[in-house]
Amino acid sequence: MGSSVSKNISKVATEALARASSDILLQTDLTTDQTQVISVSDVGGDVVISGNEFIQKATINMKALMNALIQENVQQNLTLQIAQAAKSIVSGFNMFQLPNAQNEIDLFVRASIELVNTISQVCTSSVSENYLIDIKRVKGSVRIQNNTVRQFVDIFGSCVQNAVASNAIFQDLQAKLDQSATSKADGLTLWQVAALVAIVLGVPVVSVIGGIAVAGRWMFPISILAGAGCLVVWSSQANTTMADHAFSRFVRNTSDCLGTALGPVLQTLPNSNAAAQSCLSNADCVAFDWQGTVVDDKGTNKVLTPPQTTFYNKVSSICEQAVKSNPDTTRLVRLPIFAKGVGSPQSKASPPADVYLDTATTNYYFFDPPTNMWVKQGTFAHAEWSAAKNQIDWGTITPTVSTPGTPGNIYVYYGSDNPIYFYVYVKTADSWSLYTPTLRGPGLVTDTPATINVSGFKVNQRRQWLLYLGVALIIVGIFGSILAFNSRRPEERK
C-alpha cells in the first residue's frame, strides 16, 4: 500500500486549496497595485474577469492570498470539501480490516480537518512572496483561466506534502494499514524470492561462467518448466477475501452495478463484519450491502433497527469502483457544543460539550477525543481583568455600543457557522474594543457516526510471490539456455 494515506490526503488538500485560491481570484478585481491579491501591468480600460484573447502574466501576492484563505467562510468550505473527500479515501482503504475502525476513521477525518488549519501557516513560511500566473486578456479586460487551479496545485503541492508528512496521525494510520495487509499476506517476500532464485540457479550459472555448460543444458530448461509451473499455480489458485467500503450508497442504488440479489433481505446480521463473513462463506455470494443507518440528503444519520443485509450473486465488473468513488452524504463534521461554568471542566459528560470556558479564570479548554481529556488552550484575560469585579461571556453576536457591560468585562465572539477564530472584545467606557491577536477557535469538530453503511465485494488475492518466482525462473532459464548453447564447442552445436 506504500504511502497511499499521505498521497491521497495530500492530493485532496492541495486540490481543495487550489480551487479555493482560484475562486478568490475570480471574485477579486485585478489592479496594478502590487499589494493586492492579484495584479497585472499595462491595464487599459476597465478590468473585469472576462474575455479570452491572449495570455498575459499576472502577479499573485501570496501574503494577501494567504490572508484571504484564512477567512472563516473560506476555511469552512475547505473543511467541508476535505471532510467529504476523506470519505472516499477512507472507503478505498478497506478500513474495516482494522480493529476500532470507527475510531480510526474519526482520527483520520480529524487530522484532515486540522490540516486545513495548519496549511496556511506552513505554506506562508515556505512559498515565495510573489508568483506569476498566466491569464487571458481582451483589450482592457482580463479573464482568469480554468488552468489557474492547475497552477495553484503546482504552487501549493510541496508545502502541503510537507504538512501531511509531518502529521503523526496519517503516518500511524498508514503503519496500521500496512501491518494489517502484511499480516494477511500469503507466501514469500520479494527478498525471499530473490534468495530462492539464487539458490536454485546458483550452481548452473557458475558452471556456465566457468565454461562448463553441461549442468546448464539440463538446469536451464528445467528452470523454464519450473517457472511455467509457478505461473500455472499462480493463475489457478487464489485466496478469497472481502473488500469493504464505508459510507456506501449501496449496490442496489448504483446504476453501474447491475446487481442481482441473492435471496431476500436479512435482518439478523448485527454488523458489517458479520455480513462480510457470511458472504465469504457462501460460494454464490459476490457482494453485499449492509445498512445500519438511514442517511438523508443533508447528511443526517438515523439508526436503522434492525440493520438490513442484502447479498448479491452477480454485479458488474465496475461495480466496486463505482460504489467506492461515490460515498453517501453522511456529515463527518458538526458545530462544536460550547459550555461555561465556574472552575475547570471535569469530564466529557460534565459538562457534555466540546469547548469550555471557565468564567472564574477566563481559561478555555478543548475536549480531546483520543485522550478523552480536556486540554487547556489558553486564557482570554487581559492585564486589568479581575474575577472580583469583571465578568466574561461568549457567543455568536458581535457586541455593539449598546451592548451593556462594565468596563473591563470580556466578551468572546465566535462564528455561528464555523468557530475557527475567537475575537476578544473588552468593554471600555463607551464601547467594546477588539483585542489582538485573534485566537484560534475549535472550528468544526469530527462527528463520525457509530454506525456506518458498508458494501463489500469478494476479491481473489493471488500469491504474488509465485508470479515473481515464475517470471524470474523463465527469464533466467531462457538467457541461461542461450548462454549455455553459445558456450558449447562448435562441433557440439551441430
UniProtKB/Swiss-Prot annotation:
Keyword terms: Lipoprotein, Membrane, Myristate, Transmembrane, Transmembrane helix
GO cellular component: membrane
Main subcellular location of this protein, as a coarse class: membrane
InterPro entries, per the entry: Virion_mem_poxvirus_L1 (IPR003472)
Covalent lipid adducts (N-myristoyl glycine), residues: G2
Transmembrane region(s): 193-213, 214-234, 465-485
Subcellular compartments: Membrane
Membrane topology: Multi-pass membrane protein
Keyword Transmembrane among UniProt keywords: yes
Any Pfam family the entry gives: L1R_F9L
Family to which the UniProt record says this protein belongs: Belongs to the IIV-6 118L/458R family.
Protein name: Putative myristoylated protein 006R
Provenance organism: Invertebrate iridescent virus 3 (IIV-3)
